[in-house]
């Protein structure tokens, strides 16, 4: 299914998934980067923080961006800074998140992004294993 913008131009694709775990796994596999827009739901924040965590762990090396329109994410960014000041977040991990007040500036910063933080574990050390009888992504799905 494709989403059409008011202009009628196709701007994306809608994927129906069974739960949040599958949603995040699909995004992580297929996205070239992650951008958090202004969100009114906790899921936006949860997904954002998980992608930041996965970057820190070395699960992915993709850019994580915040579209910080009108300072919407200022308190979150200040929270990260406080975490560094208090020793709960390593200084280099702050570089995982790229933020800007406009889409154009955010895209420019994201294109220049190079991971500079130290990973807790190498990307190769992460393996996907089944959790009980829970099906893995793309397993047992009709073609």
Curated annotation (Swiss-Prot):
Substrate binds at residues 23-24, 41-47, 53. Coiled coil: none annotated. Keywords: Cytokinin biosynthesis, Hydrolase. Pfam families: Lysine_decarbox (PF03641). The keyword Repeat does not apply. Its EC number is 3.2.2.n1. GO terms for biological process: cytokinin biosynthetic process. One of its GO terms (molecular function) is cytokinin riboside 5'-monophosphate phosphoribohydrolase activity. One of its GO terms (cellular component) is nucleus. It catalyses: N(6)-(dimethylallyl)adenosine 5'-phosphate + H2O = N(6)-dimethylallyladenine + D-ribose 5-phosphate; 9-ribosyl-trans-zeatin 5'-phosphate + H2O = trans-zeatin + D-ribose 5-phosphate. PANTHER family: CYTOKININ RIBOSIDE 5'-MONOPHOSPHATE PHOSPHORIBOHYDROLASE LOG8-RELATED, LOG FAMILY PROTEIN YJL055W. Belongs to the LOG family. Cytokinin-activating enzyme working in the direct activation pathway. Phosphoribohydrolase that converts inactive cytokinin nucleotides to the biologically active free-base forms. This is Putative cytokinin riboside 5'-monophosphate phosphoribohydrolase LOG9.
């Amino acid at each position: 299914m494709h989403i059409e913008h008011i202009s009628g131009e196709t701007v994306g694709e809608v994927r129906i998934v069974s739960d949040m775990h599958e949603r995040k796994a699909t995004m992580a596999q297929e996205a070239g980067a992650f951008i958090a827009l202004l969100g009114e739901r906790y899921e936006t924040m949860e997904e954002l923080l998980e992608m930041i965590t996965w970057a820190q762990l070395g699960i992915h090396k993709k850019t994580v961006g915040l579209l910080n329109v009108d300072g919407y994410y200022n308190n979150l960014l200040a929270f990260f800074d406080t975490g560094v000041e208090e020793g709960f977040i390593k200084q280099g991990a702050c570089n995982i998140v790229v933020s800007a007040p406009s889409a154009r500036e955010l895209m420019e910063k994201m294109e220049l992004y190079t991971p500079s933080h130290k990973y807790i574990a190498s990307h190769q050390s992460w393996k996907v294993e089944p959790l009980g009888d829970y099906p893995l992504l793309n397993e047992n799905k009709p073609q």
